[in-house]
Amino acid sequence: MSLCTSSHKDFSQLLPLQDIGCNKTEIKNSPAGVISPAPYSCNQSTLTAEHSPVYIPSSYMESRHEYSTMAFCSPAMVNYNIASNFGDPEAVAARQTSSPGALWSAPGHLSPLSLHCQSSLLYAEQPKSLWCEARPMEPVLPGSRETLKRKTNGNDCTSPIANNPGSKKDAHFCAVCSDYASGYHYGVWSCEGCKAFFKRSIQGHNDYICPATNQCTIDKNRRKSCQACRLRKCYEVGMMKCGSRRERCGYRILRSHRGAEERVHCLGRARRYSEAATRVKEILLSTVSPEQFVLTLLEAEPPHVLVSRPSKPFTEASMMMSLTKLADKELVHMIGWAKKIPGFIDLSLYDQVRLLESCWMEVLMIGLMWRSIDHPGKLIFAPDLVLDRDEGKCVEGILEIFDMLLAMTSRFRELKLQHKEYLCVKAMILLNSSMFPLSAEEPESNRKLHHLLNVVTEALVWVIAKSGIPSQQQTTRLANLLMLLSHVRHASNKGMEHLLSMKCKNVVPVYDLLLEMLNAHTLRGQRKPLATHPEFGPLEQMEPGESLRKGEPQ
């Protein structure tokens, strides 16, 4: 036999192998932990040989003997025949001794065969070599980071992940649910699911409530079971709203500081632009032709207001109720009309409010005169509310006011007042109603007001000139129209006094915008002494503005 080339005493037992026979199909009683060779039949003379080499353990190489490589495939390859007396104890002992397991080291020693096997085959599936030791597969949990590192860095051939070409040796894990992390999100390593959940929570409503005790386990399989505990764990592991990295947070803080500086710079630049825009508007207003100005006034005219006519016979309460309702509706449209006059909104808010509070009754009365100019003896308050002088007798003190209105309407009828002239006169009443000291704190607004009044006067002169009358008569007509403005103001003062008396007698309730305008007229007379005191400015005396804001049509 050519198993060894020396006569060492430990291998003298291999000599009787030539005399041992067997009529069984497999070898039994192999040492524990060693897989027996593939079964073979004694009747076969020759078996197919598997040419995978078997190596002698390193412990035997330490001795001074050299052993050749051999393959244990069949009895024919080791040049012996199995004897027929299989039941002989000596044969059994010899057969046990001749087991290939005798050439291996103790079970605690790592098999040298595994060191020479291809790592991809060992880690991908069970070893296919006939003589590889069988070891149970250890399950590797993806959620355990330490286990995965130990399996990856070690030489354990049972790990299915360590040497798998598709595995993630440098993978990071989600700090919330221990799943594979997709990146560094909101300050920690996290998966796509936890990143999206945290983003939704900080951007929307996050009033989650735990149905249990706020101690739910959050892992890969149970992360969707409780939103409250999942969000709590997100904050516990360090997820933050400011960004994904600290340096990004610092960059955003720096960017916010730069943004504040830019905003301050932009505010200063916007202020300069506003001043320049104001000068441009003044230039444009000065270049507006009278014809264009009149056309703008024509487009700004408010619509007709309807009011339910009280049932006859009229009573003092029913007539005053209809008149106050009509006045309140017209005041709303009056504010919109004033804002459409070119240059009016460029005035300060203080001047806008004071002008409206001073002339609102005059504007209402001249509108009434224009509607009644073609109806002698009638006052057309609204298309559905037409009154004559006799119907005003039911209201105490209003008959005098009716007579004044009818007289002024008759005078406008004699002058054959044109529509464009009426538009200019009404705008002049608004802008010339400054019977109060203008704001000394805003001289720019006062200058704008005077300039705007000049523009309206030029427009009225242009309208009279376009009528075709001689130039001398044009001057006379302008004077006649302007003289009527004093009568309109006198009538408005009478009307204001009458309305106040009706309110004090509780004849008619006054509400909304009309009440504010009426109160402003009353308070102006009471606060006159404050105007001379150096500590009080006009704005502190009146505090106007509510009527303009509440009365503005939406």
From Swiss-Prot:
Superkingdom to which the source organism belongs: Eukaryota
Subcellular location(s) of the protein: Nucleus
UniProt-annotated stretches for the region Modulating: 25-173
Residues annotated as domain NR LBD: 289-521
DNA-binding residues: 174-239
Protein family membership: Belongs to the nuclear hormone receptor family. NR3 subfamily.
Function comment: Binds estrogens with an affinity similar to that of ER-alpha, and activates expression of reporter genes containing estrogen response elements (ERE) in an estrogen-dependent manner. Locally synthesized estrogens may act via ER beta, in addition to ER alpha, to mediate seasonal or developmental effects on nearby song nuclei.
Record's protein name: Estrogen receptor beta
Organism: Sturnus vulgaris (Starling)
Gene: ESR2
